[in-house]
A protein has these predicted regions:
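Aromatic (Trp/Tyr/Phe) and Gly/Pro-enriched flexible surface segments
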Residues: 1-121, 125, 129-182
Length: 182
């Protein structure tokens, strides 16, 4: 019999919140990897996460070629409100309080201007802005909420995007954590 570990007692309830698990990125591909929406690929290439859109993609980037807030990989939301990064997190308890924390930044790809992410969990929503100079960098943000079900849907959606040299760019999301508050 194997021992079960309760994620609410040991740390992060989000699966692959650091985005370290995902498709292989070849070292000679400085543009990252475009990940298709779940409608095109029932089994998401980003374990734990669904890419929700009719036709748009997200960009999976690496620290070798981009600014990544933590670790070696992150996700850049390049299609604005037309795509969302979603995870159904099991194990939440209705009526209990939780904190969702994450990093938002830019990929050091020349994307200049105001970048924004709308984040949703349970009945709460928060828009987080990041003023990008296009040279890399990030800031940490959080959303506190009270669970309304045994499973909580966590959603990240870019509130805007930009174009640099005919290439879409947007906010980078990384280091996603969900913990129960005492």
């Amino acid at each position: 019999m194997s021992a079960r570990i309760n994620p609410t007692l040991t740390g992060n309830m989000v699966k692959n919140g650091d985005f370290e698990q995902g498709p292989y990125i070849f070292s000679n591909t400085p543009w990252g990897a475009l990940l298709p929406p779940i409608l095109e690929d029932v089994h998401s290439p980003l374990p734990g996460w669904m890419i929700m859109s009719g036709t748009k993609v997200v960009k999976y980037i690496d620290a070798q070629h981009h600014a990544v807030p933590k670790g070696a990989r992150a996700v850049e939301l390049v299609a604005g409100v037309e795509v969302a990064l979603v995870q159904e997190v099991p194990g939440t308890v209705p009526g209990r309080s939780y904190r969702l924390s994450f990093s938002i930044g830019d990929a050091r790809n020349g994307c200049v201007g105001s970048l924004g992410v709308d984040v949703y969990a349970a009945r709460e929503r928060r828009r987080v802005s990041y003023e990008s100079r296009g040279t890399g960098g990030h800031k940490c943000a959080k959303l506190e909420f009270t669970a309304i079900a045994n499973k909580t849907r966590v959603v990240f959606q870019s509130s805007n995007h930009h174009t640099v040299n005919a290439t879409l760019c947007g906010p980078v999301v990384d280091d996603v954590w969900l913990v129960r508050l005492k």
